[in-house]
Amino acid sequence: MAQLHKQFTADQVKVLLTSYKQGHLSREEIEQTLGIGKTRFFALLKQLRDHPDTFSIDYHRQSRPRLGPEAEGKIQAELLRDKELVDNKDLPISGYNYAALTDRLKKTGIRVSTTTVIQRAKELGCYQAKKKKKDQHDRAVVTSATGDLIQHDASLHLWSPYANEKWILITSLDDYSRMVLYADLVESETSWAHIQAAQYVMQNFGIPHQYYVDNLRVFRFIQNRDSVWRNHVLGTDDVNTQWRQVLALMHTDVIYALSPQAKGKIERPYRWMQDRIVRSCALEHISSLQEVRSVLREEIHRYNYLQVHSTTQEIPAIRFEKAKQENKSVFRPFTLPQGFESSKDIFCIRHSRVADGYRKISIAGQAFQISGIEPREAVELHLIPDEAMNLVEIRVWAHKKMVHRFNLPITEIDKVVHF
């Protein structure tokens, strides 16, 4: 049916609505006469009640104004800045990211669509046609609840072209919601860094059912790679790594990516993070680890709370929260396992020692008297590094309880104990 303002005058519609108010005509009769729906009917009725003297049904097309010279100039400047990054062979940036550029423009008050940016890019010669995609590993969500599978990995990159060294990005991502639960940059990849990531996830979100990781030696002992002995005594997975010991205590399973395609499923989030973070650091001349961490936090917030995920077609944080409300979560509340009184004895580095005949144990060439144990007795050491204080808290366990504790500087034991 033709538009309302082309079929009736404002006075005619006004008469019909007045008849409805007086009880002479029903809503259905007026809707049928005007050819409108319920929503449109009540919108017209509200307009008549609020502004009877200026009631109108005229249609006013609202077209977005053309971009002004200032906006066009900023778009051009940002595109040319991106072109410098793409042309720089020393940077791990091989193409344009128009969505990221649109977000940068929005911060400066320029609201423009990505399509418009692409049009301007073509005009300036700042455009690359997308390459034909190869067959990729299935990106579908393989879980039906949050906490069922946590994708966890680390990636080494030069996150800023102005930095003097590469840093490791460690992330934990919930498979169902695609929400990044943990993300941090560290100077070196250690068991302790991954243990801290697991601690953050478990204490802030709950204990997940299982982790999905690759075959890095931090996560898994593999014979023929991690042993120098040719006469094999221990096979693959016969030794639990420090990280896996923590997960075993919390009754969380681990599954491994057994193919390059499956491994790519974990590493895919690093692609967009690397691209956006490197671009931001290059454009802002950022070089320090703390500054890059700020860029990372901003990017994770945008991804979790503002961006619609291409696979789920939902914003990750909203999907995560909705799953919780609909009881689609297998996260278990964080509680200490039986026999433990402190989380320090869960999230720690474990080593074994045997006391001598004088109840002393040796660490980094130093002897320490341990009370509450027998001569020649085996004890377990729980080491908790504190890099800010440059010390390690050492908690000595025997008979399923802590019997002694002391602190040592990290510099005294970091050569004999690998965190």
Q: Model segments located where?
A:
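Residues that mark the N-terminal boundary/hinge immediately upstream of a DNA-recognition element
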Residues: 25-26, 97
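C-terminal, beta-rich DNA-binding module of retroviral/retroelements integrases
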Residues: 300, 304-419
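Short, basic alpha-helical/linker "hinge" immediately adjacent to a nucleic-acid-recognition surface
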Residues: 2-7, 18, 27-81
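Mobile-element integrase/transposase regions
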Residues: 111, 115, 122-180, 187-209, ...
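Charged alpha-helix within mobile-element recombinases
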Residues: 236, 242-334
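Basic, flexible linker segments flanking DNA-binding modules
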Residues: 52-158, 232-238, 320-323
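Acidic/histidine-rich, metal-coordinating catalytic segments
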Residues: 203-235, 260, 316
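Mobile genetic element proteins and their domesticated derivatives, centered on retroelements
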Residues: 16, 41-44, 75, 101, ...
